[in-house]
Regions:
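Conserved HGGG/HGGXW glycine-rich cap/lid loop of the alpha/beta-hydrolase fold
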Residues: 6-63, 81
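Short beta-strand/loop motif that positions the catalytic acidic residue
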Residues: 197, 203-205
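Serine-hydrolase catalytic core
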Residues: 189-198, 220-221
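Conserved hydrolase catalytic core segment
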Residues: 88-127
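Catalytic active-site module of serine/aspartate enzymes centered on a nucleophile-bearing elbow/loop
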Residues: 225-246
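Conserved alpha/beta-hydrolase "acid-adjacent" motif
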Residues: 210-216
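Conserved acidic catalytic loop of the alpha/beta-hydrolase fold
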Residues: 72-90
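Helix-rich cap/lid subdomain of alpha/beta-hydrolase
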Residues: 121-168, 173, 178-185
Length: 246
């Protein structure tokens, strides 16, 4: 069993590799620390790579009943973890929902963050054209839940992107998935606040990123004063460039 640290009221299972500057890897919806293991392994050659299961996923705890969360609550978990591990300031790499958590750390816990990789950030408040895609996605998930239960809803959201053991882990964590999904739009941030975030950052998408996610990434990169865009989808490479920069 991996060691755990206390988050904001829940125990979080943590996996560490390597030594050097701290890198915190924050997974997205329907994922876990195991999914980030290849990235952590790559980064551990030159850094202290820290991955953890967010609340409700993998070996981490969650309140009972676990029916909802917010970006800010998740960021409090991450902040508590960084303090408990004496790992700040850290390069924070967040994917999907994890990118919003990284942004909130930059906004409210600036001293804990040295730089950030924001991969596929679902910051759709600045992308009006995303409304149609998000509505269709919600309808598909709801139909899947009616037909096959909550695990089928997770499967529908993943849309074949994940298979095998990773898919089974995601479906087993369906409570955390739906808590996350409900919290996607929970982050209160204005253009003015984002323009004030001076954290060196890479806003990352890949060739496979959906158009509305790419649009969100473009909008975010234009607002963050110290951000640059990358479109190769290589989170480890983006993180390594920031490590080398420091």
């Amino acid at each position: 069993m991996a060691p755990s640290v206390e988050g904001a009221g829940v125990a979080l299972e943590v996996v560490e590799r390597g030594s050097g500057p701290s890198v915190l890897l924050v997974h997205g919806i329907a994922s876990d620390a195991q999914a980030l293991a290849p990235i952590a392994e790559t980064l551990s050659a030159h850094a202290r790579a820290i991955a953890y299961d967010r609340r409700g996923y993998g070996g981490s705890g969650a309140p009972e009943p676990y029916q909802g969360t917010t970006v800010e609550e998740q960021a409090e978990d991450a902040a508590a973890l960084l303090r408990a591990l004496d790992a700040a300031p850290a390069l924070v790499c967040g994917d999907g929902f994890g990118a919003l958590i990284a942004l909130d750390l930059c906004k409210r816990h600036r001293a804990l963050v040295s730089s950030a990789v924001l991969s596929n950030p679902p910051l759709f408040m600045f992308v009006p054209e995303a409304t149609e895609q998000l509505a269709a996605q919600r309808a598909e998930i709801e139909e899947a839940v009616r037909a096959g239960g909550p695990q089928a809803g997770v499967d529908a959201w993943l849309g074949g992107r994940v298979e095998g053991e990773a898919l089974e882990r995601a479906k087993a964590a369906h409570r955390a998935f739906f808590a996350d999904y409900a919290g996607l739009a929970s982050w209160p941030a204005s253009r003015r606040e984002l323009r004030a975030l001076d954290v060196p950052a890479v806003v990352l998408t890949g060739p496979w990123s959906p158009p509305h996610v790419v649009a969100a990434a473009e909008a975010l990169a234009e607002l963050l004063p110290a951000a640059r865009r990358a479109t190769d989808g290589d989170l480890a490479a983006a993180a390594q460039r920031l490590i080398d920069r420091d």
